[in-house]
Structures are given as structure tokens and as C-alpha cells.
């Protein structure tokens, strides 16, 4: 298992948000976590990525305990995430945004006397990432003037540019039009090839299109984990989240 959660719990005061989540995700798997608002999906992502420390349980990345580690250390171990709110450097160009992530991953530190433009290894990886997210032609555009869909694509590029092989995407298609969503799905499919993807997403079309398996989180507990076809037909999942044909 690339990512394992064992009886993971998180409480804020007397309020239990995550209630004993156990989940295993295989290397190269595309895994979606779905559930109603307030189910604890973003909290679970925050636990895995190190923004929150769990109240109990274990989180293993490639067999190594990461529960309670700070985000930068987890990132160094090969896990990166995006957020519901786009997290980019709006005043930097598309190229510079990607290069910042690459420089971090390569361990380059700020040096007043040395231009980052002369770092061949960083330049090559930046160019590869730009091509992968289809933004080579937009490389010199300030990130702040990109369309919303382009900014989301850039954020995915920043996420993978650091060399992470486990990617957490939080609502990657939220706020997109139908055509933008279709393009985003193909982009996510391409950039996660050979990587492990864990995704929180409300658009069921996206979920059933991309996911190898789906976990359903309700009130901080996983009530089902299975392949998309069985999740769609699961009576407990229909009652808790998806609804039935009669509800349409």
C-alpha cells in the first residue's frame, strides 16, 4: 500500500470530526473520496498532508509513519496536495510558479549572487511540467490574469513539479464549466499516470470517470469503499449521499 490510514481520528474539543477511518490506497491507484458537506473530507486531507495532527490512529506513506509530521516534511517524502481555493503566486509568471516548486524539490536555496535562470536542472523540469499541463504557450503570462480553469491547471502543475508521486486534489473541478471540466478530467488523467491520486470531488461525473475505487465518508466514517459500479448500486451509499433513481 502506498497510503494507509489505520483508525485515524480527529476531534476539536468534544466534537469528533473523523471517527476511526481505516483505508488503504494502492500504488498507481486513482481513489476518490465522496460524501455530503460536513462529512470531514477536507479534514481528512488536512490530516494526511500534515496541516492537522490526528487525535489518534496511524497514517503511513510508503510504509513510513507520517501522522503529526509538518507539511514540508511530508512533501519531501513524496506527497503533495492542492486546495479548494486556488493557491498560486499571482504576480509571478506561469513559468516562475512552476520553477518555484521545482527549486524547492531540488533543494536549491535563495542566492542573491546566482540567477535561477542558470540552473539547468530546474529549467528542464519546469519545461517538462509546462508541457505536461499544456501551458508552454502561456509560460510568460502572469498567473493572476489566467482564467480560473488555467489557474487550477497551474496549481496541479505546481503540485507535480516538486516530484511528488502521491497527489491529493481537493475539488479540482469546482467552479468550472462543462467544457472546462472535461478538459480538466483529461489533464488529471494524464498528469497522474504512474502516480497515486486521492481526490475529493462533488461532481459525480468526474468521480465515476476518473476513479478506480471510491470511498464514501459520512459523519467522519467511511461507510463503503469499492469500485465505481458497486458504489453506485450500494443501498447504503444511495441513502446517505447519491440518492436513487426515484429521487431524480
Describe the role of every protein-language-model region:
Residues 1-248:
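Glycine-rich phosphate-binding loops of nucleotide-dependent enzymes
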Amino acid at each position: 500500500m502506498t497510503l494507509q490510514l489505520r483508525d485515524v481520528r480527529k476531534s476539536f474539543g468534544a466534537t469528533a470530526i473523523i471517527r476511526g477511518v481505516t483505508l488503504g490506497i494502492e500504488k498507481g491507484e486513482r481513489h476518490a473520496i465522496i460524501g455530503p458537506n460536513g462529512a470531514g473530507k477536507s479534514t481528512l486531507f488536512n490530516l494526511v498532508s500534515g496541516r492537522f495532527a490526528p487525535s489518534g490512529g496511524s497514517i503511513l506513506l510508503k510504509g513510513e509513519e507520517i501522522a503529526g509530521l509538518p507539511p514540508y516534511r511530508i512533501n519531501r517524502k513524496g506527497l503533495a496536495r492542492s486546495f479548494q481555493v486556488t493557491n498560486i503566486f499571482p504576480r509571478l509568471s506561469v513559468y516562475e510558479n512552476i520553477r518555484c516548486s521545482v527549486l524547492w524539490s531540488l533543494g536549491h536555496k535563495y542566492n542573491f549572487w546566482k540567477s535561477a535562470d542558470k540552473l539547468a536542472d530546474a529549467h528542464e523540469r519546469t519545461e517538462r511540467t509546462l508541457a505536461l499541463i499544456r501551458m508552454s504557450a502561456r509560460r510568460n503570462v502572469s498567473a493572476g490574469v489566467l482564467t480560473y480553469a488555467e489557474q487550477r491547471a497551474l496549481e496541479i502543475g505546481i503540485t507535480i513539479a516538486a516530484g511528488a508521486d502521491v497527489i491529493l486534489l481537493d475539488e479540482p473541478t469546482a467552479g468550472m464549466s462543462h467544457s472546462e471540466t472535461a478538459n480538466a478530467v483529461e489533464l488529471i488523467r494524464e498528469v497522474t499516470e504512474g502516480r497515486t491520486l486521492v481526490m475529493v470531488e462533488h461532481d459525480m461525473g468526474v468521480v465515476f470517470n476518473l476513479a478506480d475505487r471510491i470511498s464514501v465518508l459520512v459523519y467522519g466514517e467511511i461507510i463503503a469503499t469499492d469500485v465505481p459500479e458497486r458504489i453506485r448500486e450500494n443501498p447504503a451509499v444511495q441513502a446517505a449521499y447519491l440518492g436513487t433513481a426515484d429521487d431524480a
